[in-house]
C-alpha cells in the first residue's frame, strides 16, 4: 500500500521500514544539529522519539536552526520540534524533556527504552556523561563534534573518536574518554581548521543579548560564542541521521 514512506521503502525495503517504525531514538540537544537529525529521522519513518533540551528559540537561531522562525521565537525548542514532527507524521510518538542533560539527572532518563542515542549537546561534561551512560546501558550512540566556526560542509566525516584530528572539541573528548577507558565512539567531525570569529562588540551576545523573555540567557555567560552558518550544522545533522537509519536497519 502506498504511504508517505513509500519512496523510502523503495530503497530500504519493508523489513527495514518496520525496524525504523518500532525504534525509539533519543536526541539530546535540539539546535542547529539536533533539529535536522529529528527532521530527517521522522521523515525516514522512525516511530518514536525522546527530545531533550531546555532552551527556547532565540532570534539568533534563525540563521541555522530548522525550528526557528519569527513565529517560534520565545517558544521551547522541544515544543516546536514536536509540533513540526507531528505535522510530518501524525502517528509519531514524541516525548519531550524540558531540561539540560547533566550527570545529576542522568538516571532520570529511560535509557533502557532507547534504541539509539544522538548526542547533539554543546558542553563536554554533558557529552561525556551521555557517552558513559549510553555505553553502560549498551545503547548505540553517535556524537556530534564541533560544527561552529566552520564553513566547509563537505569536510565532515564519520569516524571513531580515536581517528579524529584538528577538531578542538574532539581533542578534549579523546582525552576525557581515554581517562575513562572508553575505547570507541562513533562521531561526526571535520578536519577543517576553525575560523576565528570576528571580535565585534556591536554584534556580541554578551553585550547585546536578544534572548526572548524568560530565557536562561546562557549566551551572556559563555566564554566563547562561535560563529555559525545555515549550511554546516544542517549537514552534520543529516549525516548523523543517515548513520542512525543505517545502524537501526542493520540490527
Question: What residues fall within each predicted segment?
Answer:
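Conserved N-terminal Rossmann-fold NAD(P)-binding element of oxidoreductases
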Residues: 27-29, 52
Amino acid at each position: 500500500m502506498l504511504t508517505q514512506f513509500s519512496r523510502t521503502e523503495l530503497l530500504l525495503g519493508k523489513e527495514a521500514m518496520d525496524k525504523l517504525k518500532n525504534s525509539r531514538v533519543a536526541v539530546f540537544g535540539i539546535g542547529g544539529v539536533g533539529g535536522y537529525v529529528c527532521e530527517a529521522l521522522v521523515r525516514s519513518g522512525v516511530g518514536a522519539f525522546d527530545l531533550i533540551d531546555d532552551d527556547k528559540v532565540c532570534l539568533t537561531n534563525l540563521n541555522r536552526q530548522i525550528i526557528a522562525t519569527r513565529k517560534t521565537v520565545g517558544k521551547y525548542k522541544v515544543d516546536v520540534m514536536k509540533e513540526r514532527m507531528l505535522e510530518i507524521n501524525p502517528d509519531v510518538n514524541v516525548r519531550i524533556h524540558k531540561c539540560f542533560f547533566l550527570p545529576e539527572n542522568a538516571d532520570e532518563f529511560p535509557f533502557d527504552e532507547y534504541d539509539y542515542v544522538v548526542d547533539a549537546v554543546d558542553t563536554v561534561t554533558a557529552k561525556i556523561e551521555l557517552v558513559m551512560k549510553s555505553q553502560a546501558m549498551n545503547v548505540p550512540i553517535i556524537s556530534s563534534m564541533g560544527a561552529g566556526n566552520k564553513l566547509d560542509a563537505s569536510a565532515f566525516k564519520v569516524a571513531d573518536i580515536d581517528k579524529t584530528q584538528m577538531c578542538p572539541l574532539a581533542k578534549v573528548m579523546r582525552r576525557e574518554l581515554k581517562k575513562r577507558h572508553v575505547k570507541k565512539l562513533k562521531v561526526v567531525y571535520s578536519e577543517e581548521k576553525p575560523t576565528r570569529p570576528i571580535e565585534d562588540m556591536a554584534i556580541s551576545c554578551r553585550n547585546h543579548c536578544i534572548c526572548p523573555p524568560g530565557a536562561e540567557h546562557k549566551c551572556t555567560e559563555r566564554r566563547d560564542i562561535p560563529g555559525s552558518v545555515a549550511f554546516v550544522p544542517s549537514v552534520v545533522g543529516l549525516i548523523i541521521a543517515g548513520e542512525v537509519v543505517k545502524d537501526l536497519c542493520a540490527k
